[in-house]
């Protein structure tokens, strides 16, 4: 399957292009053909959402960026992920803070995000995150036939049907998450 200038292969043909947590989670999916989900090798210099879309001629409306956030309230600290369309902004200390019922929300520190997800920074995705994390997904993405996002490794991208995203563990589909 080709999307723009990207050539995607079945995840079963290229498992080495997926981070361990992503590959392990995808292997647990029932009623999903391995050909429904694909992965493409990319130049890591163009791993960022907007850069990828421009370089590989991919429609930005099918791209998803995953942001790991750290939420705090009193002595409690927890993590969540937000998957928003490429090019979107996210209102962390307004919308997300209220949604997570936190006193403060910020981007998770880079080293902590890498350690907790076991994925490479710049390619963290919503597939295979720690089970206790809440995953907020912008409603527009679940309507897409295919969403392109990180694979957990900066050398590749994952193409997954938007309809599968709403079935990820602890996922909530949220209108207007990305602005």
Report the location of each language-model feature.
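Extended, low-hydrophobicity, polar/charged segments
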Residues: 1-179
